[in-house]
């Protein structure tokens, strides 16, 4: 009886902790979005933001800066950061490996290769590449790459070797992309180079509409599968015992993770370490790995991480702008190393 009461108390304590952490993340995200709107080459006072967002001073320079540059950019960082974090969480669950993420497994590189191929072909024919076309190309590249990784997984029992295989697949895709660039025209090379560095800048409102539809829809699907995801975390045998069709569920996980990763790669280029670092940090803060608790916090954490890194990327050495991947790697890599060392000590 005492043991049962203790377990109930611990569970209610964890639930309360999760609610508090999630609320704090939401508040931090709102503050960070406000900072992104205010800070830049043109400083916009915080008390001007509500008026600008409500449609006041529509013709002022501050209004144009917010509506045409900063707001689309910060929304892109928030949505794509959350998507990348969720994708990392799904892949870590799928492979049962804490360092699995779209960048490490080569999924981002595969998406980059197909987008580059499509971009060069279309630009060579003097045709613009639409936002849906970029997402479709990146999704195809993600699926092809993760398909290769899964084929390798059938022959390799060690998850560590699987990660190495994913890295090698990523290198092959990167080499193929560089090969394509060598034969592209000057304009294509410039476009591909700028895109491949990774950045949330340049997002139009049409891009934001596509990003929002894809990310919100897929994230809702991820949240809808929290129960089978919880069962899957406890092992395939347990998942089967509670009625989960494991083979079909694995396909669903791959499709959802690939779609999220593809959307990020299509609009921001390859972004590293977000998918590894954020899920670890979120689970450590929540003291829980239950998907129903981790998924919302993971999305908020990814949004905060990318919005913060983007603010640093565009303001630290202004007017020179850093690649978003350079900043995420600077902050993400030490976090991953620290967490792995902490786990090894335990």
Where do the protein language model's features map onto the residues?
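Alpha-helical transmembrane segments in inner-membrane proteins
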Residues: 2-346
């Amino acid at each position: 009886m005492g043991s049962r009461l203790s377990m109930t108390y611990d569970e209610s304590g964890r639930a309360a902790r999760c609610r508090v952490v999630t609320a704090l993340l939401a508040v931090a995200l709102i503050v960070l979005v406000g900072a992104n709107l205010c800070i830049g080459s043109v400083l916009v006072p915080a008390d001007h933001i509500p008026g600008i967002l409500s449609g006041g001073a529509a013709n002022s320079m501050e209004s144009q800066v917010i509506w045409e540059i900063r707001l689309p950019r910060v929304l892109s960082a928030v949505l794509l950061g959350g998507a990348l974090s969720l994708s990392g969480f799904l892949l870590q669950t799928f492979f049962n490996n804490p360092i699995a993420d779209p960048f490490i497994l080569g999924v981002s590189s595969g998406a980059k290769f197909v987008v580059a191929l499509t971009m060069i072909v279309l630009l060579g024919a003097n045709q613009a590449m639409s936002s849906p076309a970029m997402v479709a190309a990146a999704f195809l590249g993600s699926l092809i790459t993760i398909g290769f990784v899964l084929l390798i997984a059938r022959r390799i029992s060690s998850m560590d070797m699987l990660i190495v295989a994913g890295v090698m697949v990523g290198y092959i895709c990167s080499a193929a992309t560089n090969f394509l660039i060598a034969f592209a025209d000057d304009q294509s090379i410039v476009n591909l180079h700028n895109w491949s560095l990774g950045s949330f800048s340049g997002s139009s409102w049409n891009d934001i509409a596509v990003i929002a539809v894809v990310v919100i829809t897929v994230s809702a699907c991820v949240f809808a599968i929290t129960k089978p995801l919880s069962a899957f975390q406890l092992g395939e045998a347990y998942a089967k015992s509670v009625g989960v069709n494991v083979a079909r569920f694995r396909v669903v996980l791959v499709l959802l993770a690939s779609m999220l990763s593809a959307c990020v790669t299509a609009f921001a280029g390859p972004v590293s370490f977000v998918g590894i670092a954020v899920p670890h940090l979120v689970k450590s803060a929540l003291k829980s790995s239950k998907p129903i608790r981790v998924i919302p916090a993971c999305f908020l954490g990814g949004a905060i991480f990318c919005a913060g890194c983007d603010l640093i990327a565009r303001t630290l050495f202004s007017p020179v702008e850093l690649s978003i991947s350079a900043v995420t790697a600077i902050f993400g890599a030490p976090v991953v190393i620290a967490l792995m060392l902490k786990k090894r000590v335990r």
